[in-house]
Amino acid sequence: TRTDSSAASDVYKRQLLALIIYRIGTHIPVPGIDPVKISSLFDQNQGTLLGLFNMFSGGALERMSIMALNVVPYITAAIVMNLLEATTPSLKKMFRQEGEQGRRKRTHYVRLGTLLLAIFQSMGFAIALSSQGMAIDPGTMFIFTAVVSFVTGTMFLVWLGEQVNERGIGNGISLIIFASIVSGLPSAIGQSFEGARQGEISLILLLTVAFMAILAISFIVWVERAQRRVTVNYARRNPNQMAMGQASHVPLKVNMSGVIPAIFASSIVLFPASISSWFGQSEGMEWLQEVSLALSPGQPLYVVVFSILIAYFCFFYTAIQFPAKDISDNLKRSGGFLPGIRPGGHTEEYIDNVMSRLTVWGSIYMIMICLLPQFLIVSANVPFYLGGTSLLIAVVVVMDFMAQVQSHLLSSQYQSLMKKANLKGFKR
């Protein structure tokens, strides 16, 4: 109906407005920055970890915008909170058993952690910029101004993401990261084809990278839709309730953790590497340059650390978000059981084994997607960074967003039908 379409249109407009505000914010520079020196620094570090970090910030780091830190402090704070929740029974009880109040407490703690991390990272950036002559008037006043600007930009992005969660569709933080990744694609593609036209890049290699990207997208969509359906039967408690005697299933995805492990792993790898990039030029800190080089994309240490982090977060996040005990308890309370398996501990063990096997394949799939395209890009010497991690994040966020859009439209249509039915009943 027209009312439904207008309501959906309002939601989409709010969503688009939030992304436009974000993109405008990435072009607001920190006061006192020397743009010529910053531009020269990034020209010298194309294709390095600094370029990777710049991609995740949507180009805000290259412009030294107030949003240069993006939502990295928020992601790091969420990682720490997940670790504390998994290892501290009191926190787990408070967050999960207190319902809405527990959720608000968790959000408050994540915000507080984001603020503290943003201050810490902002001070590191500001001191490095001042000491390396990137500021027009380096000194205490510049450091203070830069810290306030960076922290304000990060906290504004967190608030903007929460507004998208409440008033829009999809996960606000994920959409901000998605917008950051795709914002640099048009210029990067243009630079690549310009390089091919001038003979700096082989056209065959460039087309090979594009073909591999299409294959990777198709593979991601196929795996993300794959499910292992565990059959569930329900005991017939009442002859009049036919549904209780029917069989159903529990859908378990191959990649139950979604895009979170890739984001978490990238954040952890980027954090020490970004510090190394800024402070490696200082006297007595030359060893940081070696660390930065060892953690560069394509290097053995980077591959090992990144793979271990992805595998760990796949198992860790799946265990936290989808505990087998909770699934078993829910089945038991609803009268469901797995054919040939006793309810309770045996069901929990079976589900845990199935989820563990799926997570093994899910982690292998994620490592392949995140690392294999990267090797191709490094070997082809493509002058921009768009590895498997960014591709995975972009595709999964789009799939999740489209699913939520469909759910929102169905919900709007259902509410409209209910209103019409109530109106007709009232007239009678």
Whereabouts are the PLM-identified features?
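Positively charged, low-complexity/disordered segments
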Residues: T1-A8
